[in-house]
Structure formats: C-alpha cells, structure tokens
C-alpha cells in the first residue's frame, strides 16, 4: 500500500498476540495497537519505546487519513519530544485492563502517544465529555471511535 506524501495517517492494528487479544477483549474493540504514519515512516511506541521506523503495510492494519491541517516539520518536532521515552507497561495493565487512572510522564503506550500528537496539531484543544483530554484513558479502539466521532478521520484507505 502506497500512502500519499505529506499526508498524516493513523494506522490501527488488529490483535496479533496474547496482550493484543486481551486489550481488544477488555476494551470491546477490534484494535490492539495504533501508530502514526507520515512519508513512509511510522511514529510509534511499543515495548521498545517511542521511535521511528520505515512503514511496511501488513494485512492486519486499518489506515485512516488524519483530516487536520498540519505542518510536517511541526509534527516531527512534536514527536521528537517523545522519541526515546519508554513504554508504559503499568498504564497498559492498570488503565486499559483494570481502569485505574495511572500515568507516567516519561513513558507512553501507543494510543496515548497518538492522541497526544493529534491534540498537539489542534493546539491542545481536544475535549472528551466537555473536559480536557486524558490521553492515558484511550485504548486503540476507544481512540478510533473518538476520532471517527470527532470527524478527524474518514474512511479506511
């Protein structure tokens, strides 16, 4: 799959392993992971931390264009603030599987980082239930539903 240059996408993954299936089971959704895609690179966090790698399409991915005006350099600059930060295992367990509100400002999980980056593109103006966004409360499936509801993403690519 070839994506358009200088367009920002969010890529949602269907589960591939035990943790992914547990996340989708607990969150009543179909997605276990998500990441941002820009100019053939993936901007993501997983157990190796926040980093960038070349994008390779796999059949378990659903990709949506982010329908927001944005500047490529600004997006990359925002991501670099998080690059190298660790993966938040505890938040995955506690906030996604058990629903205890826990957050580590130096560690992030996938949907948390994606929502933070999207919110930065909107000058931190996103709200949920009339309150400021708490990105650590969004699973990949909840993020997908929220972005669809807010019309930030459209149809699958």
Where are the regions a protein language model picked out?
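Extended, non-globular alpha-helical segments
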Residues: 1-13
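A structural motif
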Residues: 69-93
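Activation targets extended, charge/polar-rich intrinsically disordered C-terminal tails
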Residues: 96-157
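Generic secondary-structure boundary/loop-capping signal
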Residues: 19-20, 84-87, 135, 140
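Solvent-exposed, acidic/flexible segments
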Residues: 28-31, 72, 107, 111
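Glycine-rich catalytic cores of cysteine/serine-nucleophile enzymes that process amide/ester linkages
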Residues: 10-69, 94-102
């Amino acid at each position: 799959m070839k994506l358009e240059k200088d367009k920002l996408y969010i890529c949602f993954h269907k589960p591939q392993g035990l943790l992914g299936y547990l996340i989708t089971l607990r969150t009543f959704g179909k997605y276990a992971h998500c990441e941002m895609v820009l100019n053939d690179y993936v901007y993501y966090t997983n157990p190796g931390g926040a980093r960038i790698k070349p994008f390779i399409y796999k059949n378990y991915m659903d990709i949506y264009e982010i329908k927001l005006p944005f500047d490529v350099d600004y997006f990359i600059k925002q991501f670099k603030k998080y690059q190298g930060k660790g993966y938040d295992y505890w938040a995955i367990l506690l906030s996604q599987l058990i629903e205890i509100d826990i957050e580590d400002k130096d560690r992030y999980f996938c949907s948390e980082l994606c929502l933070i980056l999207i919110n930065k593109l909107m000058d931190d103006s996103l709200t949920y239930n009339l309150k400021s966004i708490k990105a650590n409360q969004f699973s990949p499936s909840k993020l997908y539903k929220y972005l669809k509801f807010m019309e930030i993403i459209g149809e699958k690519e």
